[in-house]
């Protein structure tokens, strides 16, 4: 599937399932433009709430991840609250993502 088609589907799913105040970013090789065939799709999902709950993964992360199964793409979703992300979860991961992230969806 073409990159634009995958991104359009991700954006539509985000619009359908994510709550108000959410942000979804693409990072990694797909964001930098140096992906190869078979590269995964790295997504960062930030939720505007004080604390993540178990249900958040089933309601928000899982629908984004599983949509890739329908068209043979590996979509990986890393989910944090905005507060957790701004406090810097793991410095190397944080800087890696911040360096090349692209906005896919914000509400």
Where are these regions (language model features)?
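Catalytic core of pol beta-like nucleotidyltransferases
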Residues: 1-25, 32-37, 48-107
């Amino acid at each position: 599937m073409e990159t634009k088609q995958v991104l359009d589907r991700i954006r539509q799913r985000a619009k359908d399932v994510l709550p108000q105040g959410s942000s979804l970013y693409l990072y990694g090789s797909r964001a930098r433009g140096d992906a190869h065939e078979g590269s995964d799709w790295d997504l960062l999902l930030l939720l505007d709430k004080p604390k993540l709950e178990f249900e958040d993964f089933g309601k928000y992360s899982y629908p984004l991840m599983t949509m890739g199964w329908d068209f043979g793409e590996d979509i990986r979703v890393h989910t944090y609250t905005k507060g957790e992300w701004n406090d810097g979860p793991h410095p190397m991961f944080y800087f890696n993502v911040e360096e090349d992230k692209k906005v896919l969806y914000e509400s």
